[in-house]
Structure formats: structure tokens, C-alpha cells
Amino acid sequence: MTDNGTITVEELKQLLEQWNLVIGFIFLAWIMLLQFAYSNRNRFLYIIKLVFLWLLWPVTLACFVLAAVYRINWVTGGIAIAMACIVGLMWLSYFVASFRLFARTRSMWSFNPETNILLNVPLRGTILTRPLLESELVIGAVIIRGHLRMAGHSLGRCDIKDLPKEITVATSRTLSYYKLGASQRVGNDSGFAAYNRYRIGNYKLNTDHSGSNDNIALLVQ
């Protein structure tokens, strides 16, 4: 290290040589999270990804706050304060949207930092909720050897005749209704169906399924 506190090129090379293996593992972890951590592929990696995303918000905010406190000069201090305010507002908006979505669906998936769109499927007397990256006009349902998959998510065993007549897609602002349209049985335990969006409004899910499966949403007053 030189007298002014900077490191030389040789010291930087030695540092990289010593930490090369660790850096490789870090990049490998990034690749695995970015390529395989999806809710409909690998649930374990997806949960790790969500935890990592949750931790990034307070860590990023803390970095900008510390940069403002221990500023190099007033210019960098002002930039750090501005960025801290922006990150704080973004973090606050995430919590507001998440709690609004939770009030609508009563699902912990509402706090997913990756998306605020949730698919809700009433099946076997309960509501199965899964995250979606975008809201579609048509949602397909595929049953392969008695196992239902919808929007890429595995929802367990189901027969084509037991498919719900309605499903919903919730956001922090709206709840969209999808009605069962065309369906076709293939063989004994396989088939496919399509759900078409026909209504959208400010509703919340009705978690009481003692009655009909069709009554899955209530108007928010």
C-alpha cells in the first residue's frame, strides 16, 4: 500500500488471486438465482432469492445513509441523501402495495418483492395462491395424468370435471375474474381448459368456501 492509502497493481493482483475461488462461487450463486430461481421451477432457490431481495432494501438504504453521514464532500453527500430518500420511498411503496394486496387476498405471497400479481384458484375447499409475473387475458389449465398445472404452477391432483368455474387474479388495486371457457378431456386423467377474463373491479377474496366455489370474491366497500 502506498503512502496515500491506495493499493498498487501488484497488491490488487495478489488480492484477486487469493479471493478468486470465493468470487467464482459468488458469481455461480448469482447465476443459479437468476437462471433457476422461479416459483414454478425450484421453490427452494426461489425462497432464497426472495430473502435476498428483501435484505437488499435495508442494506441499500443503510449504504446511502452511511454515505451521507460520512460524506467525502457536499456533492456526494447531497447525492447520497437524495438516493436514500428515493430508496426509502420505494421501500415504503412496496410495503403499502403489499399490505393492500394482503388485505385483498390474505396470502403471504402478497409480500413477494418480485411481483404484486397473484393467481387465486379455489380447489378442494381452499384457495391456492401463486405469484404471476403478468396478468393475462386468458389463463390456461393443463391436467397431465391427474395433476393440474395452471400458469406454470403445479396445483396438485385434479380431474377435468372438478376444475373451478371461476378463478381470480389479484393486484394491490384490482381483482380480475376469469370464467372457465372451453375444456377438453384427453384420455382418462388428462385434459386442458381455458379461463377468460370477463370482469375486473375493486374486490377482495372471500375466504369462506362453505358454499359454492363460484362465490370467491366480495366487493370492497
Curated annotation (Swiss-Prot):
Descriptive protein name: Membrane protein
Does this entry carry the keyword Nucleus?
Answer: no
Native source organism of the sequence: Bat coronavirus 279/2005
Its function?
A: Component of the viral envelope that plays a central role in virus morphogenesis and assembly via its interactions with other viral proteins.
Q: What is the lineage of its organism?
A: Viruses, Riboviria, Orthornavirae, Pisuviricota, Pisoniviricetes
Q: Which residues form a coiled coil?
A: none
Q: How does it assemble?
A: Homomultimer. Interacts with envelope E protein in the budding compartment of the host cell, which is located between endoplasmic reticulum and the Golgi complex. Forms a complex with HE and S proteins. Interacts with nucleocapsid N protein. This interaction probably participates in RNA packaging into the virus.
Its cellular-component GO annotations read: host cell Golgi membrane; membrane; viral envelope; virion membrane
User: What does the UniProt entry say about where the protein is found?
Assistant: Virion membrane; Host Golgi apparatus membrane
One MF term from GO for this chain? structural constituent of virion
Task: List the ranges whose topology is Intravirion.
Answer: 40-49, 100-221
Any Pfam family the entry gives? CoV_M
Mind telling me which PROSITE patterns this protein's record contains?
COV_M
